[in-house]
């Protein structure tokens, strides 16, 4: 599988002040995740990763989260929580060895909840 372009970022359509990381394949969005980074607190959050069913299990989500971590360097990665029961294994797998481990963490005072 080869993506049309490298990872793309745009303002999140769901959360004010957040960004959305997207991967496109053949003109179709196949992966997206909302994220927010606070450079002051060195904290980051990701929310609502989504991979179209046809490509689930192909490593797109893992690759997208890795690209974000590589881009933002030394920050601790979290989520706001509320994961679906079926997603727990995913978060454990992608959080292994990651500062913060994508564990639940409230937003810092510098970040608008959107």
Where are these regions (language model features)?
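Conserved beta-strand in the GNAT
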Residues: 28-37, 43-45
């Amino acid at each position: 599988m080869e993506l049309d372009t490298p990872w793309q970022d745009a303002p999140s359509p769901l959360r004010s002040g957040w960004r959305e990381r997207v991967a496109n394949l053949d003109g179709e969005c196949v992966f997206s995740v909302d994220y927010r980074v606070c450079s002051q607190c060195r904290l980051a959050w990701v929310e609502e990763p989504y991979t179209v069913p046809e490509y689930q299990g192909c490593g797109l989500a893992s690759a997208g989260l890795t690209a974000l971590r590589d881009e933002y360097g030394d920050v601790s990665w979290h989520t706001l929580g509320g994961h679906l029961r079926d997603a727990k294994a995913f978060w454990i797998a992608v959080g292994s060895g990651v500062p913060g481990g994508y564990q639940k963490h409230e937003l810092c005072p510098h970040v608008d909840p959107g």
